[in-house]
């Protein structure tokens, strides 16, 4: 007959002892590693798409502002036009507290403008690269190298995917 102290002091001798073996723990670690190797890149890609979508929204807002200025002044670059109200994406990043994902810039002549969103920080990993839109609603990616009015259907598809996510 075993005493209470004997069975408690050496649980390996107890036939009813429970626990996990090293193999079982290694299987769990391997499964977690596989799940994480899929989940983390998908989460990062989701963040990049979300930030890009916000930048496009800010670009369209700035485009509407440019059109209002043209309506008032008859020119996109009239000296009376105030500085653009949006210079970063997200908009609140300029006042501090948030990471700047894109820098928004505007170049204009009397009858044309191009709004450009240049990726910053983690957004530089975005395959769409620098985004731009002009007064004719021509959308471009990768710094203007591929645009929505290209002759190549695959280029137009790539631009559509970057600007709409579809």
Regions found by a protein language model. Give the residues of each.
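Short, Lys/Arg-enriched N-terminal segments with co-localized hydrophobic residues
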Residues: 1-11
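Alpha-helix exit/C-cap motif
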Residues: 49-53, 60-82
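N-terminal single-pass transmembrane signal-anchor helix
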Residues: 12-43
